[in-house]
Amino acid sequence: MIHADHDDNLPDDEEGLPLPPSKSQRKRDMHALQDLGEQLVALSVDQLKKVPMPEALADAVREAKRMTKHEARRRQMQYVGKLMRHIDPEPIQAQLDVFNGLSKAEIARQHRLERLRSEVLDDEKVLQRIVETWPEADFQQLRTLRRNALKEREQNKPPRAFRELFRVLRDLDVGAAAPPADEPRDDDEE
């Protein structure tokens, strides 16, 4: 009955020292590191250069990217996981989170622009809102693209103007990414 007064939240041995992690926990940790390594291998070369990691790990990841044979790649991924046991994975995970966050933000931005394009096609008054948001926008060009996109849709032609309208909106958004986000806050403060 040694364990009767044992606190399950804080495992200690008889001398009051914390117990080492169980074999199952160590295996879960190793699999997590190996999964992190898989994410590294999936990155592009440019993204990989931005990840803070020791040169030996970077070499192992590059080698794993080159491998095509299943068993060889599996062994290399285990080696990547082994190398990761000796480093702090937090900076690597933080950089991966940044990459994932950026891609999610870009997807959200594209969806927002697609909705705006649909609004333009549904209502010409939206063009005025675009010109107010982005003063550098060419009202006449947007109006022509809208008219051509509607005509293409009506005649079942390829959506050339439809795509061009999206490109123009995307270029406007990239050229002035900060002002549209700031303008509503300025209006609210007045």
Curated annotation (Swiss-Prot):
GO molecular function: ribosome binding; rRNA binding
A single Gene Ontology CC term: cytosol
Disulfide bridge partners, by residue number: none
Places the protein is found: Cytoplasm
Membrane-spanning parts: none
Keywords: Cytoplasm, Ribosome biogenesis, RNA-binding, rRNA-binding
CDD domains given in the database record: YjgA-like (cd16331)
Region (Disordered): 1-31
Family: Belongs to the DarP family.
Function: Member of a network of 50S ribosomal subunit biogenesis factors which assembles along the 30S-50S interface, preventing incorrect 23S rRNA structures from forming. Promotes peptidyl transferase center (PTC) maturation.
Name of the protein in its database record: Dual-action ribosomal maturation protein DarP
Origin species: Aromatoleum aromaticum (strain DSM 19018 / LMG 30748 / EbN1) (Azoarcus sp. (strain EbN1))
